[in-house]
């Protein structure tokens, strides 16, 4: 059982399983999706070509989100370590708690146990992390979580199958979205800074309609 297979036919293809061996059962989500809307921003194109130009513009937007949720815990998904470091240095807010490869688990535990409204900032908390209830009342997705084409294996697979790259990006995006909504009556608002995200969501064939309808 999984909440993030998206397209079971393509999923089986990625696993090398014949489609005839798959029987898909779909169930409606028990979550109230009105409790986890997606809000987007205009004017911040964080593509490889324009991120240096537009990243400085995002700082005030992130500060405004942090101020709006000044008494709540949240998380900023930066996708890359470079973006994490940039935001820590330029947002310059004592609530931010980051990590490196060596202390990821330790910092996550520190974040969970703290009574302060800390904000976890990370490139790698988009899956396998459970932040129910007051542990995450808001989250910021800084940029589209495209797989890193600097990785040779990813580049080879993307060149061989463009759909695979779109699928992996959609999968990462929907998994990231799910970090703050962990049980039926939970609630969490998601902010997408990268202005390319709404178009990506609207045009990606792997993302379900219920997800596309979350943008407010």
Describe each PLM feature range.
Residues 1-3, 72-80, 191-193:
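Conserved RecA-like ASCE P-loop NTPase motor core of nucleic-acid helicases/translocases
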Residues 4-7, 30, 80-83, 126-127:
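Gly/Ser/Thr-rich loops at beta-strand to alpha-helix junctions
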Residues 9-10, 83-87, 127-130, 201:
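Phosphate- and divalent-cation-binding pockets in alpha/beta enzyme and binding domains
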Residues 14-18, 91-93, 136-137, 206-212:
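Short, solvent-exposed amphipathic alpha-helical segments in soluble enzyme
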Residues 198-216:
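Short, low-complexity, polybasic intrinsically disordered segments
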């Amino acid at each position: 059982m999984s909440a993030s297979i998206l397209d079971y036919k393509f999923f089986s293809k990625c696993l090398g399983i014949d489609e005839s061996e798959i029987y898909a059962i779909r169930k409606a989500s028990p979550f109230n999706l009105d409790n986890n809307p997606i809000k987007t921003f205009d004017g911040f194109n964080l593509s490889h070509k324009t991120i240096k130009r537009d990243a400085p513009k995002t700082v005030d937007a992130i500060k405004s989100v942090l101020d709006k949720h000044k008494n709540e815990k949240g998380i900023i998904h930066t996708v890359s370590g470079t973006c994490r470091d940039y935001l820590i240095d330029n947002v310059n807010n004592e609530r931010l708690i980051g990590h490196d490869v060596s202390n990821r688990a330790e910092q996550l535990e520190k974040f969970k146990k703290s009574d302060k409204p800390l904000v976890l900032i990370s490139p790698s908390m988009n899956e396998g992390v459970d932040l129910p209830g007051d542990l995450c009342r808001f989250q910021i997705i800084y940029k589209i979580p495209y797989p890193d084409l600097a990785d040779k294996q990813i580049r080879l697979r993307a060149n061989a199958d463009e759909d695979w790259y779109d699928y992996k990006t959609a999968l990462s995006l929907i998994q990231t979205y799910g970090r703050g909504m962990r049980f039926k009556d939970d609630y969490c608002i998601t902010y997408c800074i990268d202005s390319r995200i709404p178009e990506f969501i609207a045009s990606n064939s792997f993302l379900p309609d219920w997800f596309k309808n979350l943008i407010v």
